[in-house]
Amino acid sequence: MLEKLVTSLETCPMVQRNGYNYFIHPISDGVPIVEPELLREIGCAMVKMLDLDKVDKIVVAEAMGIHIGTVLSLMTGIPMNIVRKREYKLPGEVAVHQTTGYSKGELYLNGLFAGDRVVIIDDVISTGGTARALLSALGQIGVDVVDICVVIQRGNPDIGRDYKSLTKIEVNERVHVIDKHC
C-alpha cells in the first residue's frame, strides 16, 4: 500500500532556499500535477488508519490540506471545515497566529463550536507550527480533537500530543521514505 505516494516522494524534484532543502510534491505544493490515483490512495489509507465514527467534522488548513480533506469528506460523508488565511469577520470567528518553518501569519476559524468532534488533516508536518496553533485555538473554543493525520511527516515535531502520518521522510539531496504507516 502507498506505492504511488512513496514513488512520487522518492522521485520528486528538490530546490534549495536559504540553505534549506525543499521537496516539490503534488500533495504539498500542487505541482507538477495532482493525480487522482494518488489522492484516492491517500484517502483510502486515511480511512483505514483513522477512527472516523467519532468525528463530526474534518478540519483542514488552507491551502494544501484542502484537496486531502475533500477526498476524505467525499469518501466518508463527513463535512469539511477549512481554516482560512483570510478574515471574514463572521460572528464567532477566531484568529489563530501560525508560525511554521517558512512563514508566519494568521489563520481564521469559522463554523466550529464547543462540543464538535474533529479530525485535523494536513499535507505535511515538519515544525508542527500549524498543528500547535490549531490545537490551541480549537481547545480554547472547546472543540474535541479526536485525531490528527498528515500525509507526510518530516522529522519528529512535538505538538504536545500524538498524531498519525502516512509516511515519514528524511530530506537530503532527495527525499527518502523511512517509514510508511499503512
Curated annotation (Swiss-Prot):
Pfam families per the UniProt record, alphabetical: Pribosyltran (PF00156)
Primary residence: cytoplasm
Source species, domain of life: Archaea
Entry's EC annotation: 2.4.2.8
Biological process, per Gene Ontology: IMP salvage; purine ribonucleoside salvage
GO molecular function: guanine phosphoribosyltransferase activity; hypoxanthine phosphoribosyltransferase activity
Name of the featured protein: Hypoxanthine/guanine phosphoribosyltransferase
Stated role: Catalyzes a salvage reaction resulting in the formation of IMP that is energically less costly than de novo synthesis.
NCBIfam families (UniProt xref): HPT_Archaea, PRK02304.1-4
A single cellular component GO annotation: cytoplasm
Gene name tied to this protein: hpt
Oligomer and partners: Homodimer.
Transmembrane segments: none
Pathway assignment: Purine metabolism; IMP biosynthesis via salvage pathway; IMP from hypoxanthine: step 1/1
Originating species: Methanosphaerula palustris (strain ATCC BAA-1556 / DSM 19958 / E1-9c)
Places the protein is found: Cytoplasm
Catalytic activity: IMP + diphosphate = hypoxanthine + 5-phospho-alpha-D-ribose 1-diphosphate; GMP + diphosphate = guanine + 5-phospho-alpha-D-ribose 1-diphosphate
Keywords attached to this entry: Cytoplasm, Glycosyltransferase, Purine salvage, Transferase
Homology family: Belongs to the purine/pyrimidine phosphoribosyltransferase family. Archaeal HPRT subfamily.
InterPro entries: HGPRTase-like (IPR026597), PRibTrfase_dom (IPR000836), PRTase-like (IPR029057), Pur/Pyrimidine_PRTase (IPR050118)
